[in-house]
Curated annotation (Swiss-Prot):
InterPro entries the record matches: eIF6
Family: Belongs to the eIF-6 family.
Keyword presence, Protein biosynthesis: yes
Bilayer-crossing regions: none
Identification of the protein by name: Translation initiation factor 6
UniProt cross-references to SUPFAM superfamilies, sorted A to Z: Pentein
Pfam family, one: eIF-6
Signal sequence bounds: none
GO terms under biological process: cytosolic ribosome assembly
GO molecular function: ribosome binding; translation initiation factor activity
Function as written in the Swiss-Prot or TrEMBL entry: Binds to the 50S ribosomal subunit and prevents its association with the 30S ribosomal subunit to form the 70S initiation complex.
Keyword field: Initiation factor, Protein biosynthesis
SMART domains in UniProt: eIF6
Length: 227
């Protein structure tokens, strides 16, 4: 299932939230009825919190079924909320505070449950990132941009990336993430940082409400969500 939506009138929903194959984190600002829809479409348990008192969960955090990386600026109360949520849902997820100067991990890491791409800006943390997420990685940029996380969205079936990603980069991403297909596209009527506009797993996707019909078709194809 795929739906289009806004979070409090905002279409860059990937900046504000994080979804994996097994859980989702959403900011306190998301309305309860919207949150229930997220649970239904993505078929995962979800919780609401802020990270470092910020609603930018998707920019600050990155995770998959194996692990969750949060910035060092996260509060002890927020860590406790995440741990309680994981325990309540019997989720065995490695939770790690990464002590990096650049705290926008969601913008700088693209992951699924098979591999991850790490921006060159975080290459010194490659080993700990691999250990927490439980996958092998590739280090590099694509589309001449270091923001490999916000410029892509990946599931265990497919991946959508920035439209200026070249053919060699597409092959590299395909190999690292171990998916059958990587497509290029935009969302929210021309936004190239597709990760900032889309939440997805193999069961469904939630897309920013400004996304056009042609964009939606490319998203469905890349993520293998065509019924």
């Amino acid at each position: 299932m795929i739906i289009k939506t806004y979070f409090s009138g905002v279409s860059t929903i990937g900046v504000l939230s994080l979804a994996t194959e097994d859980y989702g984190l959403f900011p306190l600002s998301v309305e309860k009825n919207t949150l229930e829809k997220m649970k239904e479409v993505l078929n995962i348990p979800v919780t609401q919190l802020n990270i470092s008192n910020s609603s930018l969960i998707g920019s600050l955090c990155v995770g998959n079924s194996n692990g969750l990386l949060v910035p060092n600026i996260v509060t002890s109360k927020e860590i406790a909320l995440i741990k309680d949520f994981l325990k309540e849902n019997s989720l065995d997820v490695n939770l790690e505070k990464l002590k990096a100067k650049n705290t926008a991990f969601g913008n700088l890491i693209l992951t699924n449950n098979k591999g991850c791409i790490i921006s060159e800006e975080l290459q010194n943390f490659r080993k700990v990132i691999e250990d927490v997420l439980g996958v092998e990685s590739g280090v590099g940029n694509y589309a001449s941009l270091p923001t490999v996380g916000s410029n892509g969205v990946a599931t265990d079936k497919g991946c959508l990336v920035h439209p200026l990603t070249d053919e060699l980069e597409l092959e590299w991403i395909t190999d690292v993430l171990k998916v059958d297909y990587v497509g290029r596209g935009t969302a929210n009527r021309g936004v190239t940082s597709v990760g900032s506009c889309i939440l997805a797993n193999t069961k469904g996707a939630v897309i920013g409400g400004d996304t056009s019909g042609p964009e939606l078709l490319k998203i469905e194809e890349a993520l293998d969500l065509i019924d």
